[in-house]
């Protein structure tokens, strides 16, 4: 009887918040040609000469603010998700890996094979597919082991939408909010023009939430994008611009949800809770609350196990 294996993959995190480790992480991340779609001969001198020397120290300061005693929040939650799924499915071999830094995807797959996993499903923890995230996982997996089933997205999966809508519904009911802000990680506009379906996937997720949460409509919900990097145009509207403009329209009480992030990380803890919170308050906003990502919620781990089971069945 074949032994099943499940590999959960997220983006990655530095080994520590020290500038040298942050630099190593950023170098690997920003050298990925799926992420930065420029000729290497043009991009690498810019990356090594200008971006890494400055951004490594700035990012290290941010990581130092969010780092926990037990490590990077993203890694902490990744391990807890693995533990929970392993408890739910004791006969599986369940592991986590990161697209960048450690644990390495290829090395983890090899270890799973040696442990006896014959039938492996890889689940990138990016609900909405993008060339900049999911495709890099696919490329690494295919290079390491071609006989593996990969879940390419789950942005419109009914069970995922039900979980997401439940959390948003419960949070919305706790206060008298003027608007729900649904914020997704952004991508360059040029990538979408070249065929990346990411924005369509985001819009479908937003629509799925609206269909499930009665009080929400297109009139009291904004879909926006965050985490812009560099001088080029990214998909709009930008989260920061939206938050600056709302208070002057009398919209001063907002709830923010981040469906693209299944676990807390720098983009949610620092960028949402601190930077964008301050932007909204400085513009005259009064209430700024955030729907927590799934993190270690057991219902999400049950969903992961169920989703993987469906993909095992397809093999």
From Swiss-Prot:
Pathway: Porphyrin-containing compound metabolism; protoheme biosynthesis. Its EC number is 4.99.1.9. InterPro entries: Ferrochelatase (IPR001015), Ferrochelatase_AS (IPR019772), Ferrochelatase_C (IPR033644), Ferrochelatase_N (IPR033659). Fe(2+) binds at residues 185, 267. This is Coproporphyrin III ferrochelatase. One of its GO terms (cellular component) is cytoplasm. CDD domains: Ferrochelatase_C, Ferrochelatase_N. SUPFAM superfamilies: Chelatase (SSF53800). GO terms for molecular function: ferrochelatase activity; metal ion binding. Belongs to the ferrochelatase family. HAMAP family: Ferrochelatase. It comes from the Bacteria. Involved in coproporphyrin-dependent heme b biosynthesis. Catalyzes the insertion of ferrous iron into coproporphyrin III to form Fe-coproporphyrin III. It comes from Leuconostoc mesenteroides subsp. mesenteroides (strain ATCC 8293 / DSM 20343 / BCRC 11652 / CCM 1803 / JCM 6124 / NCDO 523 / NBRC 100496 / NCIMB 8023 / NCTC 12954 / NRRL B-1118 / 37Y). One of its GO terms (biological process) is heme biosynthetic process. Keywords: Cytoplasm, Heme biosynthesis, Iron, Lyase, Metal-binding, Porphyrin biosynthesis. It catalyses: Fe-coproporphyrin III + 2 H(+) = coproporphyrin III + Fe(2+). It is found in: Cytoplasm. The keyword Acetylation does not apply. Gene3D superfamilies: 3.40.50.1400.
């Amino acid at each position: 009887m074949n032994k099943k294996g499940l590999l959960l993959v997220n983006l990655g995190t530095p080994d520590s918040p020290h500038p040298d480790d942050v630099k190593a992480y950023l170098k690997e991340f920003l050298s990925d040609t799926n992420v930065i779609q420029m000729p290497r001969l043009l991009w690498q001198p810019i990356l090594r000469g200008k971006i890494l020397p400055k951004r490594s120290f700035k990012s290290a300061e941010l990581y130092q603010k969010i780092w926990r005693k037990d490590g990077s929040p993203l890694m902490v939650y990744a391990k807890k998700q693995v533990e929970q799924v392993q408890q739910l499915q004791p006969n599986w071999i369940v592991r986590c890996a990161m697209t960048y830094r450690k644990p390495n995807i290829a090395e983890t797959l090899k270890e799973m094979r040696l442990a006896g996993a014959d039938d492996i499903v890889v689940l990138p923890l990016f609900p909405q597919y993008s060339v900049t995230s999911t495709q890099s996982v696919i490329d690494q997996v295919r290079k390491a082991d071609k006989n593996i089933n990969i879940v390419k997205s789950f942005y419109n999966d009914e069970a995922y939408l039900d979980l997401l809508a439940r959390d948003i519904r419960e949070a919305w009911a706790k206060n008298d909010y003027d608007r729900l802000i649904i914020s997704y990680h952004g991508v360059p506009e040029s990538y979408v023009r070249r065929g990346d379906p990411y924005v369509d996937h985001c819009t479908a997720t937003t629509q799925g939430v609206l269909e499930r949460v009665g009080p929400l409509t297109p009139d009291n919900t904004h879909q926006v994008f965050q985490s812009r990097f560099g001088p080029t145009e990214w998909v709009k509207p930008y989260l920061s611009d939206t938050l600056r403009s709302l208070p002057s329209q009398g919209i001063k009480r907002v709830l923010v949800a981040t469906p693209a992030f299944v676990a807390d990380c720098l983009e949610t803890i620092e960028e949402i809770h601190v930077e964008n919170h301050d932007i909204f308050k400085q513009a005259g906003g009064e209430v700024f609350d955030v729907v927590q990502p799934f993190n270690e919620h057991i219902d999400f781990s049950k969903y992961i196990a169920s989703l993987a089971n469906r993909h095992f069945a397809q093999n």
